[in-house]
């Protein structure tokens, strides 16, 4: 089990990164909430991981905090929610927004996420309510503190902002026309890709 990596960030293209750990390159997929807290290329970083072994692949999912990883692990225990959908959920909204949806029984917001239909949203609301309650009690408030705060801080990129934003949304499950339309509508002069992705996602929720 690979639970934590410390190494140099070699590549990053939302939602994937490549880390050099003692000469070994690790490819990871990350939710955008974690991705945009990463340092610049060639800087050292620490990433908490969840390792998935399938018949056709071995996948690593990365998170900036142990708390966000814990929330990811709760999500994939929900019937009908796999790692890819859990990653999409945590990319489409912050942890605090997700918890807010659960507390308010806000099915309308959840079904706007790609891959989340009405039945899946209903299961999330029912199953995650009890799981989150147990998590908060077990952690004596530390997880609660996490999910009610967001340290999201976009950093500039040298790539085309609109192209990167569209590519990131498509990788999360949005259809190309929908991704292109939302990015074009959200774009303002001078926006970097991270800010643009956040604005485009918000416009669809």
Curated annotation (Swiss-Prot):
Keywords assigned: Cytoplasm, DNA damage, DNA recombination, DNA repair, DNA-binding
| Coiled-coil positions | none
InterPro entries under this entry? DNA_helicase_Holl-junc_RuvA_I (IPR013849), Hlx-hairpin-Hlx_DNA-bd_motif (IPR003583), NA-bd_OB-fold (IPR012340), RuvA (IPR000085), RuvA_2-like (IPR010994), RuvA_C (IPR011114), RuvA_C_sf (IPR036267)
Picking any one GO biological process from the record gives: DNA recombination
Provide the residue span(s) of the region labelled Domain III.
157-205
User: What segment(s) does the record annotate as region Domain II?
Assistant: 65-143
| Main location per the UniProt record | cytoplasm
A molecular function annotated in GO for this UniProt entry is: ATP binding
Give the record's GO CC terms: cytoplasm; Holliday junction helicase complex; Holliday junction resolvase complex
Residue ranges of the region described as Flexible linker: 144-156
Map out region (Domain I) in residue numbers: 1-64
Which CDD domains does the annotation name?
UBA_RuvA_C (cd14332)
Cellular compartments annotated: Cytoplasm
Q: Sorted alphabetically, which SMART domains does this protein's record hold? A: HhH1
**Superkingdom of the source?**
Bacteria
Family, according to the entry, reads as follows: Belongs to the RuvA family.
The domain-related comment in the record is: Has three domains with a flexible linker between the domains II and III and assumes an 'L' shape. Domain III is highly mobile and contacts RuvB.
What does the annotation say about its assembly with partners? Homotetramer. Forms an RuvA(8)-RuvB(12)-Holliday junction (HJ) complex. HJ DNA is sandwiched between 2 RuvA tetramers; dsDNA enters through RuvA and exits via RuvB. An RuvB hexamer assembles on each DNA strand where it exits the tetramer. Each RuvB hexamer is contacted by two RuvA subunits (via domain III) on 2 adjacent RuvB subunits; this complex drives branch migration. In the full resolvosome a probable DNA-RuvA(4)-RuvB(12)-RuvC(2) complex forms which resolves the HJ.
Q: What this chain does, per the record?
A: The RuvA-RuvB-RuvC complex processes Holliday junction (HJ) DNA during genetic recombination and DNA repair, while the RuvA-RuvB complex plays an important role in the rescue of blocked DNA replication forks via replication fork reversal (RFR). RuvA specifically binds to HJ cruciform DNA, conferring on it an open structure. The RuvB hexamer acts as an ATP-dependent pump, pulling dsDNA into and through the RuvAB complex. HJ branch migration allows RuvC to scan DNA until it finds its consensus sequence, where it cleaves and resolves the cruciform DNA.
Could you identify this protein by its name?
Answer: Holliday junction branch migration complex subunit RuvA
Q: Which organism is it from?
A: Shewanella sp. (strain W3-18-1)
